[in-house]
């Protein structure tokens, strides 16, 4: 965590909004996360603004009851997996003779961002420069980790972007702003939940694939050399597995799954576990070809709570080794959000402070000062 690294001791409220549940806690405090059933939000879209607003209020009031410090004025970070998310890669080149300076790097990042905004007309939820190349004085194009100070005729950068439809984001943002105002919370920020989780895991793991199985979809995030290499949205979620079980005659999938996998029972309501496992395996196998066998898989999402037997079943269906199961994601998500802010100057990540129309540098300075207690 940030405090253990000596990087600050600030606190912030973090809320993870999903289609099945909404979770929240105060990061940097030993506060047990509060979790409630979701409402008004399905498949990454707002379906009932009033209901979602009520649910967020219920969650925040629940957090305030278990956190003794008071939530008024705390910065709040919402993490969410939006529907209609588009993942793109974009490349730009600028002249940089005689050598690459910090100004060149800043200019090409801004060029990447502005080009994507102008072409796609969508909100940029996340952005990272994943590759730099220089054209050296011998006209050789070379990939480099950090181009600053190198002699080069030109600098090329490739960025990875997560884009969200403007209408989808604005509907969501208006609800969050109302909730923020009602509970007198501090500054507000929005991040992608799977990216935040992957960034939090980078502190403990190197190259890996994060398999984040949500209620209506699965997000597969590949991390290579500390950077995001892939981000895929797969049409498989808990609801699809539940529907498959219902089709097999299992009327209460939630209870049955919890009982069979967590308690390791042989029989539940006259259901043969092998029949249940066979149905789940068929659904999980649909995404097996999307996962590389070269890197360990980290498993997260609601099904991560079902215990060792589900992990074994998942490994069998995917043909991949599950190296870690994330049963408590809030710590990793909070760590990931913090890490992305601190790495901004190094890897090109640009956080999105959508609630305030101010400069990017101003947003970063605010987070460092107010959230993390770091003075320049």
Over which residues does each language-model region extend?
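Glycine-rich phosphate-binding loop plus the immediately following alpha-helix
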Residues: 44-46, 161-189, 225-265
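Phosphate-binding/catalytic loop of phosphoryl-transfer enzymes
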Residues: 203-230
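Generic beta-strand/beta-sheet core signal
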Residues: 81, 223, 300-302, 325-328, ...
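Nucleotide/phosphate-binding catalytic cleft detector across ATP-hydrolyzing
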Residues: 1-21, 25, 29-77, 82-208, ...
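Adenine-nucleotide phosphate-binding core of ATP-dependent small-molecule kinases
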Residues: 248-251, 257-298, 303-304
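Phosphate/oxyanion-binding active-site loops and adjacent basic polyanion-contact surfaces
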Residues: 48-56, 269-280, 329-334
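Conserved phosphate-binding/catalytic loops in two-lobed NTP-binding clefts
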Residues: 314-346
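Extended hydrophobic-aromatic, low-complexity segments
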Residues: 222, 230-232, 242-245, 307-311, ...
């Amino acid at each position: 965590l940030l405090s253990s690294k000596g990087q600050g001791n600030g606190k912030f409220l973090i809320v993870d909004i999903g289609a099945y549940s909404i979770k929240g806690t105060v990061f940097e405090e030993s506060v047990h996360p509060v979790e409630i059933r979701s409402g008004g939000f399905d498949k990454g879209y707002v379906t009932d603004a009033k209901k979602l607003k009520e649910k967020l209020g219920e969650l925040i009031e629940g957090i305030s009851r278990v956190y003794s410090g008071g939530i008024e004025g705390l910065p709040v970070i919402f993490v969410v997996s939006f529907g209609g998310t588009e993942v793109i890669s974009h490349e730009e080149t600028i002249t940089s003779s005689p050598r690459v300076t910090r100004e060149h790097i800043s200019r090409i990042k801004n060029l990447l961002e502005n080009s994507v905004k102008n072409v796609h007309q969508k909100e940029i939820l996340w952005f990272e420069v994943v590759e730099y190349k220089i054209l050296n004085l011998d006209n050789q194009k070379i990939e480099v980790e950090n181009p600053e100070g190198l002699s080069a005729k030109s600098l090329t950068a490739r960025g990875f972007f997560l884009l969200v439809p403007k209408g989808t984001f604005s509907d969501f943002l208006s609800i969050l702003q109302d909730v923020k105002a009602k509970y007198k919370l501090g500054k507000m920020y929005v991040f992608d939940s799977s990216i935040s989780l992957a960034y939090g895991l980078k502190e403990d793991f190197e190259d890996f694939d994060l398999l984040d199985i949500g209620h209506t979809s699965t997000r597969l995030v590949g991390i290579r050399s500390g950077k995001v290499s892939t981000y895929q949205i797969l049409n498989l979620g808990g609801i699809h597995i539940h529907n498959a079980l219902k089709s097999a005659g299992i009327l209460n999938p939630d209870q049955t799954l919890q009982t069979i996998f967590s308690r390791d029972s042989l029989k539940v309501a006259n259901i043969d576990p092998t029949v249940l496992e066979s149905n789940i395996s068929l659904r999980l196998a649909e995404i097996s070809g999307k996962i590389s066998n070269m890197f360990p898989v980290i498993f997260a999402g609601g099904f991560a709570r079902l215990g060792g037997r589900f992990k074994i079943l998942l490994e069998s269906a995917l043909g991949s080794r599950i190296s870690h199961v994330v049963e408590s994601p809030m710590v990793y998500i909070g760590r990931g959000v913090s890490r992305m802010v601190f790495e901004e100057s190094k890897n090109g990540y640009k956080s999105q402070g959508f609630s305030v129309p101010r400069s990017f540098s101003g947003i970063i300075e605010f987070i460092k000062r107010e959230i993390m207690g770091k003075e320049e």
